[in-house]
């Protein structure tokens, strides 16, 4: 451990080996050992980070956040200022870098281009705010929850569409002079919505699908992919480098450009079931479990 000392405040994110071809190219989200390190629940050698009464306790992202203490490796951690409320910052290492990074690192829209974001949970709102930061003149939010669409408007959406009440493709084309958007981001993982994100593209547009579905999606390879030159891509964790992207998002937050805290609500750990229910219902976009109830932010 070279970059941290006891008492540092940190945000935790995924682990990348740092030594494989893709890591050395600067794309740790494509680490050749990503799955075994982050999704297997154990170390690459099969041993567990934690045990309870002699039994293995699996983890997630090589660190696990639902715990009072955890064991991490240096690449899991991002040092953050002690002048910030640490309770707010945890989601920066996952959902917020995924949504914003998909736009800032992968799609890279130019000022004046247009983007539609399907799903206005934390990941979708992060993508939407990144579209605004990038200078998109149309930042269109699509959802079926009016409460979430209201917040999307507050956070910078130029237009909102409740796709339960109107045809999203028709509405998007109306907002873009009949062309469609240059970029679309699907955060829903709903097959039909993913297909809609492709139909809503302008010629030469790109749809980034960053949520998963167990179902196949239908893509018109002739009209959409060939004639209209559209592209459909997958993106993992926003192609982010947490040690770069998390501080960047914090700076955007300081400047009032990335108000991620407006999506958050604190819950005691004993309220975990209520937090889960509020997340499912859409009442709370980003529930945060505060395990240390004695923590006081004094910044």
Residue spans for each PLM region:
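Adenosine-nucleotide cofactor-binding segment
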Residues: 114-120, 129-196
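C-terminal hydrophobic helical "lid"/dimerization subdomain
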Residues: 195-199, 203, 241-299
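Glycine-centered, small-residue-biased loops immediately flanking beta-strands
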Residues: 205-206, 230
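Rossmann-fold NAD(P)-binding glycine/threonine-rich loop
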Residues: 212-229, 244-247
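N-terminal Rossmann-fold NAD(P) dinucleotide-binding loop
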Residues: 124-125
């Amino acid at each position: 451990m070279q970059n941290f000392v006891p008492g540092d405040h940190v945000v935790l994110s995924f682990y990348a080996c740092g030594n494989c071809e893709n890591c050395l190219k600067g794309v740790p989200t494509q680490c050749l050992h990503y799955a075994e390190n982050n999704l297997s629940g154990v170390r690459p050698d099969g041993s567990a980070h934690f045990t309870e009464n002699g039994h293995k306790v699996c983890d997630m992202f090589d660190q696990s956040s639902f715990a009072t203490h955890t064991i991490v490796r240096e690449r899991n951690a991002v040092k953050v200022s002690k002048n910030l409320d640490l309770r707010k910052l945890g989601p920066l290492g996952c959902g917020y870098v995924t949504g914003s990074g998909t736009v800032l690192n992968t799609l890279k829209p130019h000022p004046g281009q247009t983007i539609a974001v399907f799903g206005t949970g934390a990941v979708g709102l992060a993508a939407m705010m990144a579209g605004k930061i990038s200078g998109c003149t149309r930042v269109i939010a699509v959802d079926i929850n009016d409460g979430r669409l209201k917040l999307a408007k507050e956070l910078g959406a130029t237009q909102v569409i409740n796709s339960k009440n109107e045809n999203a493709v028709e509405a998007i084309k109306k907002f873009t002079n009949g062309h469609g958007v240059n970029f679309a981001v699907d955060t829903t993982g709903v097959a039909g919505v993913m297909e809609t994100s492709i139909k809503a593209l302008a010629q030469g547009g790109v749809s980034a699908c960053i949520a998963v579905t167990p179902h196949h999606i239908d893509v018109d390879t002739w009209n959409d992919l060939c004639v209209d030159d559209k592209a459909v891509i997958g993106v993992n964790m926003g192609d982010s480098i947490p040690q770069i992207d998390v501080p960047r998002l914090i700076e955007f937050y300081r400047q009032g450009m990335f108000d991620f805290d407006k999506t958050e609500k604190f819950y005691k750990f004993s309220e975990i079931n209520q937090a889960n229910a509020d997340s499912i219902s859409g009442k709370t976009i980003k529930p945060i479990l505060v395990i240390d109830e004695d923590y006081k932010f004094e910044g």
